[in-house]
């Protein structure tokens, strides 16, 4: 999916808006968008950002001792 930066957007803000998190996805988005890091922390308005599909981490099952 392709999205475009809004005024004052940072890459992590875009990742949170689309993926709901930044952990493990910012690096993937940077890899899919060569040259994006050179634009600076605040992306110019209208910058196209390709958002690749990201694998979700498996949810670890927890056990409560007092159930």
Swiss-Prot record:
Keyword Kinase: no
Record's note on what induces expression: Expressed in the late phase of the viral replicative cycle.
Keyword Ribonucleoprotein on entry: no
InterPro entries, alphabetized: GpX-like (IPR008861)
Keywords assigned by UniProt, alphabetized: Late protein, Viral baseplate protein, Viral tail protein, Virion
Disulfide pairings: none
Highest taxon, organism lineage: Viruses
A GO CC term assigned to this protein in UniProt: virus tail, baseplate
Location in the cell: Virion
Known role: Might be involved in the peptidoglycan digestion during virus entry into the host cell.
Protein name, per record: Baseplate protein X
Organism the protein comes from: Escherichia phage P2 (Bacteriophage P2)
Lineage: Viruses, Duplodnaviria, Heunggongvirae, Uroviricota, Caudoviricetes
């Amino acid at each position: 999916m392709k999205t475009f930066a809004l005024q004052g957007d940072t890459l992590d803000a875009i990742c949170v808006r689309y993926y709901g998190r930044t952990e493990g996805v910012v690096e993937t988005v940077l890899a899919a968008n060569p040259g994006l890091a050179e634009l600076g922390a605040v992306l110019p308005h209208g910058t196209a950002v390709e958002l690749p599909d990201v694998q979700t981490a498996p949810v670890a099952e927890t056990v409560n001792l007092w159930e």
